[in-house]
Amino acid sequence: MYGIEYTTILTILISIVLLNYILKSITSMMDFIIYRFLLVFVIVLPFIKAQNYGINLPITGSMDTAYVNSTQQESFMTSTLCLYYPNSVTTEITDPDWTHTLSQLFLTKGWPTNSVYFKSYADIASFSVNPQLYCDYNIVLVQYQNSLALDVSELADLILNEWLCNPMDVTLYYYQQTDEANKWISMGDSCTVKVCPLNMQTLGIGCTTTDVATFEEVANAEKLVITDVVDGVNHKINITLNTCTIQNCKKLGPRENVAIIQVGGSDIIDITADPTTIPQTERIMRINWKKWWQVFYTVVDYINQIVQVMSKRSRSLNSAAFYYRI
């Protein structure tokens, strides 16, 4: 009997010790699993973006989002305005503080003096190919000059729109334009551009590919040329390479925060786009030639009307181009 009791007690003690060992083993295993999971979580956490409610937008002088134009009720306290003008302005206006004077005048129209910037350019053709536009609203003054041999409508097309361009090797390759937004832009001291359309067998249509004299001339001795040909047709191109460069460009869309004011020649009478007589619905104006002070006074006086048809730092593909003439 005593042997049975001792055996029972011993069995119970062994069971208790074994159970205690099993529980400790399970506890240690759970601790190992939990700590390892926490370690992995801490390591991976910096690489996890749990809340990503937006996308990265490329900014090239404008945000690729259309903004509702609310300038009519805006005090412009948070907006910036850049006025671009030719270097010839400082030849006529000798006052070293002329920009300060204009800043004070813009202040009377609701533009703080630290929000208006004046920037000069030497060559409108070079400026138009790669304009550096820094402000919420950008106004470019273009002076009319017959001697420049420039088509102002082509300048406006370049400045008022964003372009993606790549160089062309017309000596080795044929080129075709894919759609209406695809243009060939030539620029230089003297650009003469000739083209020869090709059929499916790369034979000239109305021209001979080996005889430049048979090519169709689309531009002669111009400083800036935007060539538009029939889409989807290969072309052999001839250009005065020693005085001109050519690029294959794609129009991305309008810069809605940019306006052009063309300062016309003294022999031109045109009030069709004058902001002083016609309410503006586009971003293109004209002011017939006056002294530069009078031009700037006109711009200041009508600045808030001008920006009504612009969009602050916006580039909407559905909006019309904008060009003013003074």
Curated annotation (Swiss-Prot):
Disulfide bond residue pairs: 82-135, 165-249, 191-244, 196-207
Keywords on record: Calcium, Capsid protein, Disulfide bond, Glycoprotein, Host endoplasmic reticulum, Host-virus interaction, Metal-binding, Outer capsid protein, Signal, T=13 icosahedral capsid protein, Virion
GO cellular-component term (any): host cell endoplasmic reticulum lumen
Residue ranges, annotated region (GPR motif): 253-255
Signal peptide range in chain numbering: 1-50
Amino acids binding Ca(2+) 1: 95, 206, 214, 216
Protein's cellular compartments: Virion; Host endoplasmic reticulum lumen
Coiled-coil segments on the chain, per record: none
UniProt record similarity statement: Belongs to the rotavirus VP7 family.
Quaternary structure annotation from Swiss-Prot or TrEMBL: Homotrimer; disulfide-linked. 2 Ca(2+) ions bound at each subunit interface in the trimer hold the trimer together. Interacts with the intermediate capsid protein VP6. Interacts with the outer capsid protein VP5*.
Its job: Calcium-binding protein that interacts with rotavirus cell receptors once the initial attachment by VP4 has been achieved. Rotavirus attachment and entry into the host cell probably involves multiple sequential contacts between the outer capsid proteins VP4 and VP7, and the cell receptors. Following entry into the host cell, low intracellular or intravesicular Ca(2+) concentration probably causes the calcium-stabilized VP7 trimers to dissociate from the virion. This step is probably necessary for the membrane-disrupting entry step and the release of VP4, which is locked onto the virion by VP7.
Miscellaneous remark of the record: Some rotavirus strains are neuraminidase-sensitive and require sialic acid to attach to the cell surface. Some rotavirus strains are integrin-dependent. Some rotavirus strains depend on ganglioside for their entry into the host cell. Hsp70 also seems to be involved in the entry of some strains. In group A rotaviruses, VP7 defines the G serotype.
Protein name: Outer capsid glycoprotein VP7
